[in-house]
Each structure stands twice: as structure tokens, then as C-alpha cells.
Amino acid sequence: MGGWSAKPRKGMGTNLSVPNPLGFFPDHQLDPAFGANSNNPDWDFNPNKDHWPEANQVGVGAFGPGFTPPHGGLLGWSSQAQGTLHTVPAVPPPASTNRQTGRQPTPISPPLRDSHPQAMQWNSTAFQQALQDPRVRGLFFPAGGSSSGTVNPAPNIASHISSISSRTGDPALNMENITSGFLGPLLVLQAGFFLLTRILTIPQSLDSWWTSLNFLGGSPVCLGQNSQSPTSNHSPTSCPPICPGYRWMCLRRFIIFLFILLLCLIFLLVLLDYQGMLPVCPLIPGSTTTSTGPCKTCTTPAQGNSMFPSCCCTKPTDGNCTCIPIPSSWAFAKYLWEWASVRFSWLSLLVPFVQWFVGLSPTVWLSVIWMMWYWGPSLYNILSPFIPLLPIFFCLWVYI
């Protein structure tokens, strides 16, 4: 096997009836260790070499005309495998003579008592009595099986597979429902976080506006930096804790927070009163604005039971009531004033001032117009901190 030889080699390569499973190296011509069936071991002068361009030619294979390399395929070196076309006889071969004509009927199955005599004892009384023993029952029935009546049939394969699936994992959930279930809270959380960050800037903006009133025409500078605890130059709205002006900054922020809460409370009460959910019924006895008779402006009769009273009545009589035809907002304002006057008696001292202020309403309006004209360029900066509250007020107005 080790050397080159010009003499034809006898052995595995010379037996052309043995098929070459690979079909690429017929007769081991490309293997330099073999020179079988070669008059000249040199590949360039080997007349039996495999010409690869001829492999693209169409020849007759083992399964009819088709692509068959000239050196043969899985069937070896037969003439048909090498591409030689053989004439197939038109007459089919004769039928086999060792078969009977037609199909024979299926023989009748023997009775169960003959084919499976051991199965007949399952329905016997002795067998059922023996099953009462837990040790015997465990040999025939799995855990949780039933032994009443006849023996249980074979378990359902489909149900068994489904039970395995239920133990290994639940089926895939609807991704659309999962996405909508997660995106909704995430969007609400993002919107709430955005509104929260904007609302937290309201005290700082109002504090800046408040301190700017003390430094008209100049930049506000904290006065506490020249005290015994010197600090770097900073604004009075961002005092460090060691600055003496820090406590005044916290006091201003606290007053601003109370003002914002009062504003939200007033808006909520106005909204509830607008929807008739507050029993606001100001009583003005002896006033000429009252009218006795059928309540045309009331939505609920006097003797009716309503969860949200919206009728302002003084003396209900036979379905009639004394109605005060005033706007609900004025009724709400009077309700707040009466509520505050009871709890804060010093507010009664402001009544003459309020009456005088109302009497000077044209002057007041002119003053307001003048202030708006003066603060017009910076009006947006003053009102911009309250813009995040508008969506909250709108949601309360719609959903309450």
C-alpha cells in the first residue's frame, strides 16, 4: 500500500461490482496511496480518471433519466449507473403465481374468555372482594383510582398529555392584553410624575416672584450672607441650611403651599356646588329678592327626598317653597363667608371694608387694569407655575 506502481493493482479497487458509497473517488484514483486499476499512476496520464466536466452531463441514472455523474453514484460501476440507456421491455412481467386471487376475509376474533382468560376474573365477585385490601388495590390501580364496578379502562392519552402540560407550564397568554395592561398604568405613572415635577416647581417660582418684589429693578440677593455665618453669594430662594435666610425661605414656601391647597379646595367646593352636591341654601328673610310660589328655579320639590339638595327653600308648604333666585356661585360664597364668620369672629370687622371695596368697584377695576398693563410682559411667568394644575382641575370637572 505504500509505493507507486505501474502494474495494475488487484484488490478493492479492481472489483468494479463493489459500489462506491461516496461516488466522488471511483477506484481510489485520487488517493496517492492506491494505484489500483491504473496503467499509469500519474493523474495527468491516467485514462480512467474522473473528468469532472462530464459530471454535468445528463445521463440515465438508477431511477430514470436525470443527473448522474459518469463514474456512477450509489449503485457502483454498472452500465446503467454510468449513463448507458437500456431499453425497458413494454410487456410487464407476469404476475406471481404464489398468491391466491383476491383478498381473503379477516378471520373472526376468538372470544375474550379464550384469548384473555385472565381478564374474565376482573369482573368476578372474588376479585372485587380482593380489591378491598389496600395492598391488592395498589397493584391494580394507581393513586386515586376507582375500584367500583368493573376495572377502569386505559387512561386517555390526550388528557394525560394535557395534565402534563398543565403541570409543566401554562399556555402562552395574550400579549395584547398584557401590553395594554402594562402600558396603561405606565402612562398614568409617567403623566403623574410629570405633573408632580411641575407642581413642585410652583413654590419655587412663586417664591422667586415674591422675593423679586423686594428688589425692584435689581437682582435679588440674600441678605443673610453678611451675617455672622458668611456664605457664598446666592439667591434668597436657594438659601443653604446654614444661612440665616433659610428659615424665611421655608416660611415663604409653607405659605405658598397653603395657598395652593386653599386654591384646590375652593375649586373642588365650587365644582361640588355646581353639580348640586352641597346643600348650600342661603336664607335671606324679608328680602325683596325672594318669591313665594311654585319653585320654577328649583330642581327638587320641597317635600321630596333628594340625595343632593339643590332647592333653596325656607318654608315648604304644599309643594311650594320660598326660592332665592341667585346664582349658585353667590350662594357658595355666602356659605363660605358664614362658615368662616362663625369660626373666626374677627372677620366681621372686615365687613365695612368689604362694603367700601365693593362700592369702589370702578376704581378697583381701573387699578386691576393698570396692574395688568404694568405686569403684562411678565404675566406668563407669573401664571406659568399654575399651568400643571389645569389638567387636574379639568379631570376633577369631568369625572366628579
Swiss-Prot record:
Q: Pfam families, per this entry?
A: vMSA
Q: Which residues lie on this side of the membrane: Intravirion?
A: 2-253, 203-253, 370-375
Similarity comment text for this entry: Belongs to the orthohepadnavirus major surface antigen family.
Record topological domains on the Virion surface side: 2-181, 275-348, 399-400
The entry's cellular-component GO terms read: membrane; viral envelope; virion membrane
Lipidation sites, kind N-myristoyl glycine, are G2
Q: Which InterPro entries did the record assign?
A: HBV_HBSAG
Q: Where is this region: Pre-S2?
A: 120-174
Uses in industry and biotechnology: Systematic vaccination of individuals at risk of exposure to the virus has been the main method of controlling the morbidity and mortality associated with hepatitis B. The first hepatitis B vaccine was manufactured by the purification and inactivation of HBsAg obtained from the plasma of chronic hepatitis B virus carriers. The vaccine is now produced by recombinant DNA techniques and expression of the S isoform in yeast cells. The pre-S region do not seem to induce strong enough antigenic response.
Full protein name: Large envelope protein
Where are the annotated coiled coils located?
Answer: none
Residues covered by region (Pre-S1):
2-119
Note on domains (UniProt): The large envelope protein is synthesized with the pre-S region at the cytosolic side of the endoplasmic reticulum and, hence will be within the virion after budding. Therefore the pre-S region is not N-glycosylated. Later a post-translational translocation of N-terminal pre-S and TM1 domains occur in about 50% of proteins at the virion surface. These molecules change their topology by an unknown mechanism, resulting in exposure of pre-S region at virion surface.
Q: Where is this region: Pre-S?
A: 2-174
Q: What is its main location?
A: virion
* Any GO BP annotation: fusion of virus membrane with host endosome membrane
Spell out the post-translational modification annotation for this entry: Isoform M is N-terminally acetylated by host at a ratio of 90%, and N-glycosylated by host at the pre-S2 region.
Q: Where in the cell is it found?
A: Virion membrane
Q: Does the keyword Ligase apply?
A: no
List glycan-bearing residues. N320
Stretches for region Disordered: 1-20
The organism named in the record is Hepatitis B virus genotype A1 subtype adw2 (isolate Southern-Africa/Cai)
